[in-house]
Amino acid sequence: MVIMVDKYEALQDLMRRRGFVWSSFEIYGGARGFYDYGPLGAIIKRKIEKKIREAFIREGFFEIETPDITPEEVFIASGHVDKFVDPLTECKKCGSRFRADHIVEEVLGIDTEGLSAEHLTQLIREHDIKCPECGGELADVWYFNLMFETYIGPYKDKKGYLRPETAQGIFVNFKRLNNFARNQLPFGVFQIGKAYRNEISPRQGMLRLREFSQAEVEIFFDPKQKEHPHFEEVKDEVLRFYPIENQLKNLGMIELTLDEAVKKGYVMNTFFAYYMAMVKRILLDIGIPANKIRFRQQLPEERAHYSSDTWDVEIHSERFGWIECVGIAYRGNYDLSRHVKESGADLTVMIHYKEPKIIKKLKISLNMKRVGPKLKGDAKRINQKLQEMTQEELKKIFEGLEKIGKVFLDGYELEKEDFIIKEVEEKVHGEKLVPHVLEPSFGIDRPFYLLLENSIVMDEDSRVYLKIKKDMAPIEVAVLPLVAKEPLTSIAYEIFRTLQKEGFIVVYDEKDTVGRRYARYDEIGTPYCVTIDNQTPEDNTVTIRDRDTREQIRVKIEELPEKLRELIFG
């Protein structure tokens, strides 16, 4: 336990002191839930984003970029205005506010996931739970919307929100994106950007932020075509699963190939399974150890309002336990259907049949001679409405007429005789459908922190350094003259400039002893130091020192860029 605390504190110190991450607005006392990326942290963050971006571009996906500020109508349609909430309570004495479920969970040691505000209030009263700040009485629990509210323009009649997810920017653009994809399913679209959640009480440092970065991928597909064409390439990939059944029975994780997971019913289909493999491979490519990754199926009460099945991809932290870093959610057609309903836009895809089909269709219209005098000017409008109804809507009218002999339509009571009902046969060449969506959603900040936590090494000789995956290092090469004297400095600087032009992230450093400089660059994860010593002017060679082994090899200067490229990028 002591080693764990020391490691955590050493990492916090390293991140602040060496320019990875620090609290935002420090000179004004800071603000909880906000962090700034320093020069080294920003490089690693961009490298994580690059790994994700390149992986999905290789799959043939499209990237877009949409605004952070979004009109209220979008989030009314998506359900976020009503459902993106957390339970909140307030101390009646000191006015402090807290996540009610967190307080109850900490005091009673129970799982509060999915408990209603009323149930949480009941537990607070039954167990006389008090304010953790002053011991005062807590108010009844209510729901607090986590979106940051704002206004678009100078007037308050146009409400907006900072987006809580990047996904909606993709969904509202579906019509244009579908045209870009030439009306062919499946296709994928991703967006990397900021999202915002006004967390009630952000805790655990970088793991719970009010402003954070996401990479969300929306894969649109025909729900009748749930098999991925390239599943054979990944079916033998072994993943660690923690399905619902094992959680409820305390059975622990199981290791299965993706093929086994699909056949045993843990994963719904090969389409879902393929992207599980892809997510795992991206995390490995970032540098997360395989034994620190697991796939945990969310319990029904944990799922977001739009999800019918979600697997969280979690990374293990020595200090915080298993941390959700990626969510893979089956969103069905929830989002697109909601936007169709609220906006009236046509967000369907035309699926063409291989051969035309003959289908039976119900057609209902008004018997204008009979209803004309009764409906008067509304008859034409109601008849047009009937022509625009879906088959499902027409079937409901037909069933109502068959059961009780009448229906109510736009305020009028109409009998079966008021309609002309026909069943006709039509030759159709395809059908329109609202696509379903599978969403892998990556956090960026959590994998960033957990990459560093899993990379920090504390040697027995008190050496602290980042054993980060070599191509993820913020500084890839340090060029060091053995001493700050000519001709070593001139040669070293020329090598530094050459490596810059070759595309390496490289620094030149001639200050302090070479031992101190090695330690300085080991600490921030620089995988290789190139040293120009007294032998260099004689034979045009330099040493390359390995961060992890501290061993050195000599290479000719002209071979240096290619050798470093091989060592760092493989």
Swiss-Prot record:
E.C. no: 6.1.1.14
Enzyme class: ligase
Database matches in SUPFAM superfamilies: Class II aaRS ABD-related, Class II aaRS and biotin synthetases
Catalytic activity reported: tRNA(Gly) + glycine + ATP = glycyl-tRNA(Gly) + AMP + diphosphate
GO cellular component: cytoplasm
GO molecular-function terms, A-Z: ATP binding; glycine-tRNA ligase activity; protein dimerization activity
Cell compartments where the protein resides: Cytoplasm
InterPro entries: aa-tRNA-synt_IIb, aa-tRNA-synth_II, aa-tRNA-synth_II/BPL/LPL, Anticodon-bd, Anticodon-bd_dom_sf, Gly-tRNA_synthase/POLG2, Gly_tRNA_ligase_arc, GlyRS-like_core
UniProt cross-references to PROSITE patterns, sorted A to Z: AA_TRNA_LIGASE_II
Binding residues for substrate: R99, E165, F212, S213, Q214, A215, E216, E439, P440, S441, F442, G443
Residues reported to bind ATP: 197-199, 207-212, 324-325, 443-446
A Pfam family assignment: HGTP_anticodon
Alphabetized UniProt keyword annotations: Aminoacyl-tRNA synthetase, ATP-binding, Cytoplasm, Ligase, Nucleotide-binding, Protein biosynthesis
Family matches, as Gene3D superfamilies: 3.30.40.230, 3.30.720.200, Anticodon-binding domain, Bira Bifunctional Protein, Domain 2
One GO biological process term: glycyl-tRNA aminoacylation
NCBIfam families with a match to the protein in the record: glyS_dimeric, PRK04173.1
Family classification: Belongs to the class-II aminoacyl-tRNA synthetase family.
Function summary: Catalyzes the attachment of glycine to tRNA(Gly).
Protein name: Glycine--tRNA ligase
Taxon lineage: Archaea, Methanobacteriati, Methanobacteriota, Thermococci, Thermococcales
Gene (UniProt): glyS
